[in-house]
Design a protein with these regions (language model features):
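Conserved N-terminal alpha-helix of the aminotransferase class I/II PLP-enzyme fold
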Residues: 5-24, 31, 57-115, 123-130, ...
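Active-site C-terminal subdomain of aminotransferase-like
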Residues: 262-357, 460
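Extended charged low-complexity segments that act as oligomerization/scaffolding linkers
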Residues: 2-17, 67-76, 142-169, 282-295, ...
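PLP-dependent enzyme catalytic core of the Aspartate aminotransferase-like
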Residues: 1, 407-465
Length: 465
């Protein structure tokens, strides 16, 4: 029986996802407001959540699909072998791009970062062989399903083998607690658990939804060195905004690392992986193909990784000073523009000693008079109106920003923050421009998106347009 045709390019890029990337109705978009094809005329500061695929990555995925179409033959065994061969190629390319030794690293592709968290928890259970405690920061700073995935990963014979402790990252006014206080809370829970002979899995986040890094690397290293047989460290690096040296260091220290190619690097959503240092090889499961309900390999996850690698390779080849220059330009333009706003302000972020420019910022929202924090519903309305604007409604450009995240306002009222972030594809585009032209373009686009947010906030309370 001939093998079924591979789906078309757009369908391939959503293959193997869940309701989060399923295309909805006539819009042809997923719940993030993103379609699985390039979209011209859209300026996306939304890489903290999801972005449209770039034209360059689209072409790379098209070439991958054509190659898979030509190489697939009759029989599921051949198809599975082809999937595994391509997964190995992706791993090798990733390692070369990031300066990693493939032989010293365990690796597993996942449909999402959430799935990768579940596997990390399952590996910790294999290491400990008994019930354990997971210690992480507050769930709203990371993926919406991460906490549940960590618990589900501990399930054995129908029973959850892990308990979860969450540490507060922000206070009642939405501002970050001190790094010292957060570290102390992590250490207190870890110390108490180990004293009770309960192993501990510590989750470090690099970066969170608001750009935070916690607990400190110094504390994580102290915990791991103090009781290596009874602790494991998972680094949630889903945003993947760190430098290559940081990723290399995590793996050299034998941490587990969750990452995705679908945030900073602009691949379609559901493009995850779990990495582990060489010490994890003893408990690492056999790397089998990701299959659907009929047992057929999911080539969609490979296609999405093909898109991610397209940007990763080009970005990592840029000189450090070029990357730094455009990140600094983004940070300077955004901080200056928001400082001039009466309805927007930057939310603080824990950086754990990092002094370089940032690519992700969270924005608090107030009414136009600056008197009160916007309610969660008001922030949602501002987000929806800006992200759903059509070209004919805009002067020249249409913008996309990151999804709202629950947070307390400075006045102690429940609110949400919005996010603006620079992506690798946008930085690569800027790097191809003459410097003065690129800086002017970026400043104008930041002025445009912040101005659009201010306009939508001013319209709150007025009748629908």
């Amino acid at each position: 029986v001939p093998m079924p045709e591979l789906p078309g390019l757009s369908a391939l890029l959503v293959q193997g996802g869940d309701e989060r990337i399923a295309l909805q109705g006539e819009s042809g978009q997923n719940k993030y407001g993103v379609s699985p094809a390039p979209r011209a005329g859209l300026v996306e500061f939304s890489s903290s959540t999801a972005s449209h695929i770039s034209a360059e990555a689209w072409a790379a995925v098209d070439a991958f699909r054509q190659r898979m179409h030509e190489e697939r033959s009759d029989g599921p065994e051949h198809e599975r072998a082809l999937w595994q061969r391509e997964a190995r190629r992706i791993r090798t390319t990733f390692c070369t791009t990031w300066g990693l030794e493939a032989a010293q690293m365990s690796w597993h592709l996942h449909r999402s970062g959430t799935d990768a968290h579940a596997m990390a928890s399952a590996l910790s259970l294999r290491k400990f062989g008994r019930p354990y405690r997971i210690v992480m920061g507050e769930a709203c700073e990371t993926g919406s399903k991460v906490a549940q995935a960590l618990l589900e990963g501990s399930r054995q014979q129908g029973r959850l083998m892990a308990e979860l402790s969450e540490i507060a990252i922000r206070g009642e006014d939405g501002a970050c607690r001190s790094a010292q206080a957060i570290d102390q809370d992590f250490l207190r829970v870890v110390t108490q658990s180990l004293a009770e002979d309960v192993p501990v899995m510590v989750v470090r986040v690099d970066e969170s939804k608001s750009g935070c890094c916690y607990p400190s690397q110094a504390l994580v290293q102290q915990i791991a060195a103090g009781s290596p047989q009874h602790t494991s460290v998972l680094v949630d690096c889903s945003q993947l905004r760190c430098e290559a040296q940081v990723l290399q260091d995590y793996l050299a220290r034998q941490y587990l690392v969750v990452l995705t190619g679908s945030k900073f690097y602009g691949a379609p959503a559901f493009c995850g992986a779990l990495l582990g240092g060489a010490d994890w090889a003893a408990v690492w499961p056999q790397d089998l193909p990701d299959v659907d309900a009929h047992g057929r390999p999911n080539f969609g996850v490979l296609a999405r990784w093909e898109a991610a690698l397209c940007a990763m390779q080009r970005y990592q080849q840029l000189p450090d000073e070029v990357r730094h220059e455009w990140l600094a330009c983004f940070e300077e333009a955004l901080t200056q523009r928001v400082a001039a706003s009466s309805s927007l302000s930057l939310l603080d972020a824990l950086r754990d000693g990092r002094s370089g420019p940032r690519s992700l910022f969270a924005l608090r929202c107030r009414d136009s008079g600056g008197q009160r924090s916007l309610s969660p519903a008001e922030v949602e309305r501002v987000y929806r109106r800006l992200n759903q604007m059509q070209p004919q409604q805009a002067q020249e450009y249409v913008y996309a920003i990151g999804q709202p995240v629950p947070c307390m306002g400075a006045d102690g009222q429940r609110s949400q923050y919005l996010r603006l972030s620079l992506s690798a594809p946008m930085l690569l585009m800027l790097a191809q421009m003459p410097q003065a032209q690129g800086r002017a373009w970026l400043r104008a686009r930041i002025d445009g998106v912040v101005g659009g947010l201010e306009e939508e906030i001013a319209l709150l309370g007025q009748s629908d347009r």
